Amino acid sequence: PSVNGKKLECASCHQPDASGVFMQRVSFERNCRACHSLNFDENNPGLEVPHAGPAQVRAFLRSLPTQYADFAARELKMTRQSENREFVARQMENLRSRSLSGENLERAVFFAGGRIGEATTIAGLGGPGRARFAGCAYCHEVTPKGEAPPLISPAQVPDRWMANARFNHAQHVSMSCLQCH
């Protein structure tokens, strides 16, 4: 895959630590956001669900008319109140027409919902791919909690993939990552 027209390589996300022995932890903001946007509405690519706790995400979703109004003023420079109000009404109707309002929207955001995107190949491994935004469950384990916001576990990314291995990446810089990975 490519990001901003540049081919994605192992080093795009995986950076050696200062010793060159291990890799730095991958973080969403630094390594994932460019490919895995939190945009939930393809009609408004600049409007994203916050990468925050479930209560904040639920509050964002339940305040969508306000979020759309702020987005229209900030990003689309809609300054007339009537124009802004019409924009918000259109966006809310677009969501409703796709069954993405209220509980259905929350379910689609918190739980991956099975939306599958284009097939991609990473490090030679094929797969069905995922939509650019496929819900919190794309990376996190999400547990329903009845009427309360769901429990969202931190993404499970190990600090060391092979805890007992004694391998020094710095000694293998002449090799392509794909030769082993």
Stretches found by the model and what they are:
Residues 1-8, 17-138, 142-166, 170-171:
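Primarily the internal scaffold of c-type cytochrome electron-transfer domains
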Residues 168-181:
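Conserved mid-sequence domains
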